[in-house]
Curated annotation (Swiss-Prot):
GO terms for molecular function: 8-amino-7-oxononanoate synthase activity; pyridoxal phosphate binding. SUPFAM superfamilies: PLP-dependent transferases. Keywords: Biotin biosynthesis, Pyridoxal phosphate, Transferase. Pfam families: Aminotran_1_2. Substrate binds at R21, H133, T352. One of its GO terms (biological process) is biotin biosynthetic process. Pathway: Cofactor biosynthesis; biotin biosynthesis. It is an enzyme of class 2 (transferase). This is 8-amino-7-oxononanoate synthase. Homodimer. It catalyses: 6-carboxyhexanoyl-[ACP] + L-alanine + H(+) = (8S)-8-amino-7-oxononanoate + holo-[ACP] + CO2. Catalyzes the decarboxylative condensation of pimeloyl-[acyl-carrier protein] and L-alanine to produce 8-amino-7-oxononanoate (AON), [acyl-carrier protein], and carbon dioxide. The keyword tRNA processing does not apply.
Length: 384
């Protein structure tokens, strides 16, 4: 089979399963509204959970940062790309989340890959929730360590896997809020079992940070756990992009030596770090509290109105509200019908989610209004 034949076969298989991914160019894709092809849609597909992507203070901070530092960092943080703006953001994040150190990364994917590949060796074992994000599972699969997956949120299964002999160290990997189901991990129980077997815990809280907990401190703070490795991202609750790893002084120094994604990547622009500092200030403020309260009310309104639809509603109290349809074609058809009626919704299909669980992944944001939720419910009931 030639290269072209290999490529064609893979694409044909995706088309046959109604699983071919496509991108849609949009004029505006974050916040309450999505604009595409000169039409405005209510946006139920973005992860801008607090509606901060268009916040004037954050935009102003980015502009001022660009004027001060330029539009790029100029290199890796190990060369010339680590600015006082990066340093200030790291210090503020560490203080906010109760860690000694924070290290910035250009994306959550890069942060997860960097940590897992740097921390584990051949004699070690990674025990990951089966529904962990692709960045976590891919890194674990590519690492020299042994990978074992436990049934989603099943602490008893996790304990059995940890109890089997391992010549090296064990790293337990999970998420705070799961990206496709919107449910939360039982972090306190997971941490307890991990500690009983002398392992370390790594939590990716991409979808919880900024959105839940006191001052938006996220899933771990809310559940009173302190994992050895906490990954937070800035493309969701923060409304920007990028990520950080929270850890001890020793682990931070170790990652600075061995995390190749950190060492060999151009660091985020200092102007972006300034924007993230402004976003963090909003998240920690009374305004941040108000946005979280509004989002919670919108979620309650949606869940109350969707109960009698002929879909499976995931057990989620987060901004991620999946309606599980099952069939790929049906999910695509529903998404298209909703778009025709002014609601931009995305169909998520395998391999992103398990086979037979194609869904409409609905996401709510504090930028929405109650009438937006009512309109979504009206359209869903008309197409259920």
């Amino acid at each position: 089979m030639s290269w072209q034949e290999k490529i064609n076969a893979a694409l044909d298989a995706r088309r046959a399963a109604d699983a071919l991914r496509r991108r849609y160019p949009v004029a505006q894709g974050a916040g309450r509204w999505l604009v595409a092809d000169d039409r405005q849609y209510l946006n139920f597909s973005c992860n801008d959970y607090l509606g901060l992507s268009h916040h004037p203070d954050i935009i102003r901070a980015w502009k001022q940062g660009a004027e001060q530092f330029g539009v790029g960092s100029g290199g890796s943080g190990h060369v010339s790309g680590y600015s006082v703006a990066h340093q200030a953001l790291e210090e503020e994040l560490a203080e906010w989340l109760g860690y000694s150190r924070a290290l910035l990364f250009i994306s959550g994917f890069a942060a997860n890959q960097a940590v897992i590949t740097a921390m584990t060796a051949k004699e070690d074992r990674i025990v990951a929730d089966r529904l962990s994000h692709a960045s976590l599972l891919e890194a674990a699969s590519l690492s020299p360590a042994q990978l074992r997956r436990f049934t989603h949120n099943d602490v008893a299964h996790l304990a059995r896997l940890l109890a089997s002999p391992c010549p090296g160290q064990q790293l337990v990997v999970t998420e705070g809020v799961f990206s496709m189901d919107g449910d939360s991990a039982p972090l306190a129980e997971i941490q307890q079992v991990t500690q009983q077997h002398n392992g370390w815990l790594m939590v990716d809280d991409a979808h919880g940070t900024g959105v839940i907990g006191e001052q938006g401190r996220g899933s771990c703070w809310l559940q009173k756990v302190n994992p050895e490795l906490l990954v937070v991202t800035f493309g969701k609750g923060f409304g920007v992009s990028g990520a950080a790893v929270l850890c001890s002084d020793a682990v931070a120094d170790y990652l600075l030596q061995f995390a190749r994604h950190l060492i060999y990547s151009t660091s985020m622009p200092p102007a972006q770090a300034q924007a993230l500092r402004a976003s963090l200030a909003v998240i920690r403020s009374d305004e941040g509290d108000a946005r979280r309260e509004k989002l919670a009310a919108l979620i309650t309104r949606f869940r109350a109105g969707v109960q009698d639809l002929p879909f499976t509603l995931a057990d989620s109290c987060s901004a991620i509200q999946p309606l599980i349809v099952g069939d790929n074609s049906r999910a695509l058809q529903l998404a298209e019908k909703l778009r025709q009626q002014g609601c931009w919704v995305t169909a998520i299909r395998p391999p992103t989610v398990p086979a037979g669980t194609a869904r409409l992944r609905l996401t709510l944001t504090a930028a929405h209004e109650m009438q937006d939720i009512d309109r979504l419910l009206e359209v869903l009931h008309g197409n259920g």
